[in-house]
Amino acid sequence: MGNLVIGSRGSELALWQANHIKERLKKECFIESEIQIVKTKGDKILDTPLNKIGGKGLFTKELEELLLKGAIDLAVHSLKDVPVVFEKGLDLACITKRADVRDTFLSVKFPDLMSLPKGAKVGTTSLRRSMQIKLKRQDLDTESLRGNVQTRLKKLECGEFDAIILAEAGLCRLEIQGAKYRKAFSVEEMIPSMGQGALGVEMLKNHKHFATLQKLNDEESAFCCHLEREFVKGLNGGCQIPIGVHASLMGDRVKIQAVLGLPNGKEVITKEKRGDKTKAFDLVQDLLEEFLQSGAKEILEKAQLF
């Protein structure tokens, strides 16, 4: 049998992720593999904010189509990009140990968000980040920032933005300092996206190596990420919707923090639940119920208009 084929997007970060899985497959599963680069819709359309492109799976659909055809054996994703409902026959074979989940502030001139002058331009791809920035600083101008990590940093250095917000995990993986000023938000200051910091490996469920990849699975990270994905699924949300959710374990206890609102920060719901790990999925349902009672569906419908 030939090498397994790993499907990956072509950015430096995506290829770091694919190579990370390739190395672990060889070392831990004794499986040789090769990487095939695939351009997704989200990679091709760079002049439009992600939420305006429309559809789910902007960074995964083309990879999933190749999985279903058998043209590739596995697809490596940033888990935060993976839709909560899979195409029939596909599923996550594993979720890797989570890297840093936090979002990070970067600027050439200003040390942190609160030091930015009124009307300063902040670049982000994410409505979730925009919402939480506006919640703290309604006077700031949040604008869409597309492209790979290096492209976004160049736009900051050229003065197109006063500050930008990126995922800390990506900066760490690429060993990028980023800018003169770099400060990670705490989870309490900016609740991350579902699955942020983790990689998800997607395969056909009936693939002969599907179970083998459980060797790469991190039990705690997978448990927390599945809780987060269950919350987003309950709201019919996707990765381009302004929802943040983060689950964490402290021994046999679990904490789930969530935020949802309009990108302009005008209507926002923030709640958290704590409880026994054995009842974690019940806690998610309780949290969902509280969000729905607080008008979550109506807010998400309004958010679609932004």
Curated annotation (Swiss-Prot):
Q: Which reaction does it catalyse?
A: 4 porphobilinogen + H2O = hydroxymethylbilane + 4 NH4(+)
In short, the EC number is 2.5.1.61
List the cofactors: dipyrromethane
Q: Quote the record's cofactor note.
A: Binds 1 dipyrromethane group covalently.
Please give the InterPro entries that the UniProt record associates with this protein.
Answer: HemC, Porphobilin_deaminase_cofac_BS, Porphobilin_deaminase_N, Porphobilinogen_deaminase_C, Porphobilinogen_deaminase_C_sf
Q: Where is it found, in Gene Ontology cellular component terms?
A: cytoplasm
Presence of the UniProt keyword Transferase in the record: yes
Q: Which GO terms describe its biological process?
A: protoporphyrinogen IX biosynthetic process
Post-translational modification S-(dipyrrolylmethanemethyl)cysteine, affected residues: 239
Gene Ontology molecular-function annotations: hydroxymethylbilane synthase activity
Top EC category:
transferase
What are the record keywords, sorted? Porphyrin biosynthesis, Transferase
**Which pathway does the record list?**
Porphyrin-containing compound metabolism; protoporphyrin-IX biosynthesis; coproporphyrinogen-III from 5-aminolevulinate: step 2/4
Family annotation (Pfam families): Porphobil_deam, Porphobil_deamC
- Report the function annotation for this chain: Tetrapolymerization of the monopyrrole PBG into the hydroxymethylbilane pre-uroporphyrinogen in several discrete steps.
The miscellaneous remark of the record is:
The porphobilinogen subunits are added to the dipyrromethane group.
NCBIfam families the UniProt entry points to: hemC
The text of the family note is: Belongs to the HMBS family.
Give the multimer and partner information.
Answer: Monomer.
Protein's name according to its UniProt entry: Porphobilinogen deaminase
Classification from the root reads: Bacteria, Pseudomonadati, Campylobacterota, Epsilonproteobacteria, Campylobacterales
